């Protein structure tokens, strides 16, 4: 019996519905409810937020299915869950549980150092990280319905997310003025599917939404990423590692929606406590940088 797969149009359409919103990492039902009440458009169920994964070291795997199930039962908004890069069985288990999206995530320890998942063989849509157009196009070619910047998870430092968003956007702009021969050469140079690049050139944009992720810690960070062209924002450790998660969650949602209302963002920031402790990217070795995982 052949596997049933979801159509590309339906998967991408589901992701489009999250545009302009905030997706929050949660580790239990209580946090999921806080996220929903704050206005999150979806939650990401995982065992530990990225900052705790970074601190603990070792191997980071898919969350216990019990945690994912508790979160799914607690909220009415879509629930995402992370699986390891290339781990077919983790993804199939999450799909069988009925999660709304799977994040093939570099936050977890990769299971396969050669292959990402063939996401077009699944019914459930996938979100994947990217730092540049080559990574974005490869993930789209594999069937990703949604992209996000990799940033540097668990640091509370927005600099890498900014770098990745600007990089992808500038490469998309450059692609739009290329002729077919140049696109073929570009596909070879960056290891990207030609048809995906051709589609981007013809439409002047990526065929899927691209959210900001990795290092968002304040309402100002979220608004900045929207200014730079993000379709929405993922917040990992930034909310539940802050002094007042409920206030931070609501403020980040409002700042994402009203990202050019600087007076509002200033008022929101005044009412908040202390943000999560940040890490300087320069203090991390290449081996410690989660963004280096995947290819």
Swiss-Prot record:
Instruction: Give GO terms for biological process.
Output: amino acid metabolic process; pyridoxal phosphate biosynthetic process; pyridoxine biosynthetic process
One MF term in the entry's GO annotations: pyridoxal 5'-phosphate synthase (glutamine hydrolysing) activity
Q: According to its UniProt record, which residues of this chain constitute the active site? A: 82
Stated role:
Catalyzes the formation of pyridoxal 5'-phosphate from ribose 5-phosphate (RBP), glyceraldehyde 3-phosphate (G3P) and ammonia. The ammonia is provided by the PdxT subunit. Can also use ribulose 5-phosphate and dihydroxyacetone phosphate as substrates, resulting from enzyme-catalyzed isomerization of RBP and G3P, respectively.
The family note in this entry says: Belongs to the PdxS/SNZ family.
On assembly, the entry states: In the presence of PdxT, forms a dodecamer of heterodimers.
What is the protein name given in its UniProt record?
A: Pyridoxal 5'-phosphate synthase subunit PdxS
Provenance organism = Staphylococcus saprophyticus subsp. saprophyticus (strain ATCC 15305 / DSM 20229 / NCIMB 8711 / NCTC 7292 / S-41)
């Amino acid at each position: 019996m052949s596997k049933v797969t979801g159509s590309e149009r339906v998967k991408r359409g589901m992701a489009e519905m999250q545009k302009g919103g905030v997706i929050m990492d949660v580790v239990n039902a209580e946090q999921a409810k806080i996220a929903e009440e704050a206005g999150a458009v979806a939650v990401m169920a995982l065992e530990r937020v990225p900052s705790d994964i970074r601190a603990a070291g070792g191997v980071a795997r898919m969350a216990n299915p019990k945690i994912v199930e508790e979160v799914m039962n607690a909220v009415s908004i879509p629930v995402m869950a992370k699986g390891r890069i290339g781990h077919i069985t983790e993804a199939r288990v999450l799909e069988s549980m009925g999660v709304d999206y799977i994040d093939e995530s570099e936050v977890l320890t990769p299971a396969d150092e050669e292959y990402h998942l063939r996401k077009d063989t699944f019914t459930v849509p996938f979100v994947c990280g990217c730092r540049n157009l080559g990574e974005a196009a490869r993930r789209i070619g594999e069937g990703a319905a949604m992209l996000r910047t990799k940033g540097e998870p668990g640091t509370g430092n927005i600099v890498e997310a900014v770098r990745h968003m600007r990089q992808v956007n500038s490469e998309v702009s450059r692609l739009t003025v290329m002729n077919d021969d140049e696109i073929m050469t570009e596909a070879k140079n960056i290891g990207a599917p030609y048809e995906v690049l051709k589609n981007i050139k013809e439409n002047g944009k990526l065929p899927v939404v691209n959210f900001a992720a990795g290092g968002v810690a304040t309402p100002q960070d979220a608004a900045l990423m929207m200014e730079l062209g993000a379709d929405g924002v993922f917040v990992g450790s930034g909310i539940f590692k802050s002094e007042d998660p409920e206030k931070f969650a609501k403020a980040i949602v409002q700042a994402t929606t009203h990202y050019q209302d600087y007076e509002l963002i200033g008022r929101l920031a005044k009412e908040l406590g202390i943000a999560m402790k940040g890490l300087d990217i320069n203090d991390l070795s290449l081996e410690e940088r989660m963004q280096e995982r995947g290819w």
